């Protein structure tokens, strides 16, 4: 679709098929390579069901985000929707926590990449897995941040290259795993699916990790679904560039479910092949790329790991470019100080990059590079958006504002699905064991506690103070809308 012309050039909008492909590419990332071990350990032979439940939940929330795009066509997704529904007072908190969540997500991805790289390069060295503050892993992490900064200096062409590299890497690795795995299963009559029982142990269910209620399959599935949901993260960012899409109010609600269904089918096929090859091997593996543990052939296993590594590298480059821009967008809108949006001669917002990189490094250090806890944190941090955006959609659907008058209401997508998203989000959020974030070896993790307080309380509070100080300075009163 060709849009309006700017300076003599036609602006090409993303059509329906392009939005579907964007959705698939946004969702399929490192998650499917990293999460199967933990999910099998938590759910045993029911691991595929955990991915199905995670996919259904992701689909519901994705439709909620897409439906909200019918009312708000500007870029920004959760920040734009919340601001339109409740005004700046709520929008500021969502915008700031969204930027923080993106920084955490980048840190988790960078941690996975560094851990995998060190294990591939130095497989028999104990120092490659050291978790101390001053360790080879920390130094490699800092070096990797430096490499990403250098790549950012090359601008958009480097980002396009990174996206292409990531797509090729993950497509090659998944295709090789599925095709090669099916060939082994059919020619050698391999079926180790039942070994998932040996890896399974029922997990106690406790509210917020404090009040234990019971122990059984339900509690295990709840935690397994949270971990599996990491493999679907990315769907919430599809609507970020709504202005670049052709008829987003019509295409997004149709494209996102198709993308989620396609990704879910790929994940189920991948997981089934992996569990047939060796469920117990995946669950017992100490490697970052758990999926490769099911493969007995060393060469084949290396191909999968390298493909996953290439995919993670590309995703990290894209995250290092996108996450700082969330801070600059808030600065451009007056929510944060303008110096956060200042760019150097290479068009890189250095202050925002430094803030993002600091948060990206801080959380993996606080959680001692623990992959399971980092995965949980990356998912739980997103629940602020998963709860507030559905509430915002309900408010937008009830709005009688002129700009929303032309939008056709649909009781199912405007009310039922948002309520389902809220209930499930709250249920999953209270099911998570937060002790893994706030405690370490039985004692308080003061580093992690301080980070949570600073990022989710202090920083938003400072944003509010800055915004209202600016409002008073220009002699205007902030609108509650």
Curated annotation (Swiss-Prot):
Gene Ontology cellular component list: plasma membrane
Subcellular localization(s) per the UniProt record: Cell membrane
This protein's name: Uncharacterized transporter Mb2001c
UniProtKB keywords: Cell membrane, Membrane, Transmembrane, Transmembrane helix, Transport
KW Cell membrane (keyword) present: yes
Principal cellular location given in the protein's record: membrane
Record-stated family: Belongs to the amino acid-polyamine-organocation (APC) superfamily.
Role description: Probable amino-acid or metabolite transport protein.
Cystine residue pairs: none
Organism the protein comes from: Mycobacterium bovis (strain ATCC BAA-935 / AF2122/97)
Membrane-spanning parts: 14-34, 46-66, 90-110, 134-154, 167-187, 218-238, 258-278, 303-323, 377-397, 411-431, 446-466
One Pfam assignment: AA_permease_2
